[in-house]
Amino acid sequence: MSRSKVFFDITIGGKASGRIVMELYDDVVPKTAGNFRALCTGENGIGKSGKPLHFKGSKFHRIIPNFMIQGGDFTRGNGTGGESIYGEKFPDENFKEKHTGPGVLSMANAGPNTNGSQFFLCTVKTEWLDGKHVVFGRVVEGLDVVKAVESNGSQSGKPVKDCMIADCGQLKA
C-alpha cells in the first residue's frame, strides 16, 4: 500500500509562510490516517457539528516551544472541539509507531479512545507520549515551517500570532 501525502499551506500573522508536507502511515493505522487525509481534502462535507469536516481555515491553537504545535479544532478553534469523519470520537488504533523526534504527526486526545480531529506535530522527541497518543505520519517537507509556527508559541501554549492552515489537501502520488 502506498502512503498518502497531504499538505498544509500556513500563514503566520496573516502572511504566507510556506508548506508542510506530511506522509501518512496508511499501512500501519489506516483508520487514523484516513480520517486525517479526509479532513485535509474536506471530501466528507459537513459534520454533525454543522461545520465542514475540513482543516482549511483552522488554526494551531496550542503551540509550546521545544514540544509541539497542536491544531485540528475546526469547530471551536480553542482546543475544546473538533470532530472525526466517523462521528465524534474514535478508538486508539494502535501504538506501533513512536514519538521519535521532530516532525512526528500524532493524535491529540483527552484520554484513551478519544480521537477526533485534533493533532499535533512534534518539534522534539516526546517518548513519554508513546502508548498514549497514536502516531500516524511524519513531516517529509517543510520542517522549517513547523519551526516557524513553533517560534510563535509560549509556555502557556497560547500563540503570539495567529498560525493558520490557509489551505490543505492531498498530493498526487
UniProtKB/Swiss-Prot annotation:
Residues 7-170 form the PPIase cyclophilin-type domain. One of its GO terms (biological process) is protein folding. The keyword rRNA-binding does not apply. One of its GO terms (molecular function) is cyclosporin A binding. It catalyses: [protein]-peptidylproline (omega=180) = [protein]-peptidylproline (omega=0). Exclusively expressed in the single anterior excretory cell. It is an enzyme of class 5 (isomerase). GO terms for cellular component: cytoplasm. Keywords: Isomerase, Rotamase. Its EC number is 5.2.1.8. It holds the Pfam family Pro_isomerase. Catalyzes the cis-trans isomerization of proline imidic peptide bonds in oligopeptides. Plays a role in protein folding, transport and assembly. Belongs to the cyclophilin-type PPIase family. This is Peptidyl-prolyl cis-trans isomerase 3. It comes from Caenorhabditis elegans.
